[in-house]
Amino acid sequence: DMGGHAFTRAEDNPKKVERSLRIMDLALDLGSSVVTTHIGVVPADPAHPRYAVMQEACRAMGEYGDKVGCRFAIETGPEKAVTLRAFLDSLGCRSMCVNLDPANLAMVAGDDPVAAVKTLAPYIVHTHAKDGRMITYHDPEIIYDFFADGGIGDLRLEDCFQELPLGQGVVPWGEYLAALRGIGYDGYLTIEREVGPDPAADIAMAVNFLKEKLA
């Protein structure tokens, strides 16, 4: 993850893109053909000035990925699946793909993770197994600026959303996993637990939860 404002600022992108290309090289040296990261908030309107800035950066990384055989997977979250799908379609690169995080879609974008699987199907190469719920909707631009700048005024993240152990949030795991199977996805369900008093116990529970769901 490039941190800061990801790939949303033209003046920062040459250095960040170059570093990302080297990260892809390193991943291949380590035997991995997928790199995942956040790219920033994709505007819903293609006419937004930031859209072209992000296109240029992602197209450069995608074209390099096509050349060397490494896929660059954008983690879902700040924008709805239909917006991300349109953005990816506009790039024309096989290697710009998706790391589907169902909890981010539900917690931040207020999107349906099951429908997102179908919308993003051609691009999904990796997934996170994470759960949570939205408490109050807030503009994802504000939330992701908090992560970039470390300040969110009088708003607290715990007032926006809550990450929860698997099965305790709003992700409909039966339907979600069935949707992944339906598009032929047989890759990783990478458990992600970033908060809570005992993340290790939550991860162990998540392993058993997924085993039961996949049985």
Language model: regions and residue ranges:
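Histidine-acidic metal/acid-base catalytic patches
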Residues: G31, R59, K67, A81-A215
